[in-house]
Swiss-Prot record:
Gene Ontology MF terms in the entry: dITP diphosphatase activity; ITP diphosphatase activity; metal ion binding; nucleotide binding; ribonucleoside triphosphate phosphatase activity; XTP diphosphatase activity
Subunit structure, as described in the record: Homodimer.
PANTHER family, per the entry: INOSINE TRIPHOSPHATE PYROPHOSPHATASE, INOSINE TRIPHOSPHATE PYROPHOSPHATASE/HAM1 PROTEIN
Residues involved in Mg(2+) binding: 38, 67
One GO term describing the cellular component: cytosol
Family: Belongs to the HAM1 NTPase family.
Catalysed conversion reaction: XTP + H2O = XMP + diphosphate + H(+); dITP + H2O = dIMP + diphosphate + H(+); ITP + H2O = IMP + diphosphate + H(+)
NCBIfam families: RdgB/HAM1 family non-canonical purine NTP pyrophosphatase
Residues where substrate binds: 7-12, 68, 151-154, 174, 179-180
Record-annotated membrane-spanning stretches: none
Function: Pyrophosphatase that catalyzes the hydrolysis of nucleoside triphosphates to their monophosphate derivatives, with a high preference for the non-canonical purine nucleotides XTP (xanthosine triphosphate), dITP (deoxyinosine triphosphate) and ITP. Seems to function as a house-cleaning enzyme that removes non-canonical purine nucleotides from the nucleotide pool, thus preventing their incorporation into DNA/RNA and avoiding chromosomal lesions.
Protein name: dITP/XTP pyrophosphatase
Entry annotated with the keyword ATP-binding: no
């Protein structure tokens, strides 16, 4: 099945394609579609649904949308839904390095570095059928970035199970425990049953 991914992020596309290998995952920009809806929701679910509905109205085909982010306990859940824009002045996307540096500076000298990645994923098959799931992956924030894999905050997100940051894991290891991997596993069962 051809599934449109409501994103412009090629790294997300790669992860989704790895986890849904029997489907063809397409970004809007792959087909020349301009897509950048305003994420005005106050939760991961609301933002995922905004993206899913906006893209579905354009393509009239199955759409997968996620909204995910890093939630740090000491920062009261920040960056949260603002992870891609954390530290920006006018709400624009910031580089991964800028987001990482902001989180690390805010946690300087802090002992409680517990955090989680959260992902809410929505699969919209048609105007009447959708499925949503929210998953998390627990970990903590390191003192400094480590590893070159992954993307976003992966170099500072340490998971006990492997004793490494997400950026130090193979894609298979990361997908087996990540927030997005867990959500996609649930979504794949929904798609198969539909």
């Amino acid at each position: 099945m051809k599934i449109y991914l409501a994103s412009g992020n090629v790294n997300k596309k790669r992860e989704v394609q790895e986890l849904l290998p029997s489907h063809t995952i397409v970004l809007p920009k792959d087909e020349g579609i301009e897509f950048d809806p305003e994420e005005t929701g106050s939760t991961f679910f609301e933002n995922a649904m905004i993206k899913a509905k906006a893209l579905y109205h354009i393509v009239k085909a199955p759409v997968l949308a996620d909204d995910s982010g890093l939630c740090v306990d000491f920062l009261n859940g920040a960056p949260g839904i603002h992870s891609a824009r954390y530290g920006s002045i006018e709400g624009e996307h910031v580089s991964a390095e800028a987001g990482i540096n902001k989180v690390l500076s805010e946690l300087k000298g802090v002992k409680d570095r517990s955090a989680r990645f959260a992902c809410c994923m929505v699969c919209l098959l048609d105007e009447n059928r959708f499925y949503s799931v929210q998953e998390t992956c627990e970990g903590h924030i390191t003192e400094a970035p480590s590893g070159s894999g992954g993307f976003g905050y992966d170099p500072i997100f340490f998971v006990e199970k492997f004793g490494k940051t997400f950026a130090e894991l193979t894609s298979e290891q990361k997908n087996s425990i990540s927030h997005r991997g867990r959500a996609l596993f649930s979504i794949s069962r929904f798609i198969k049953g539909s």
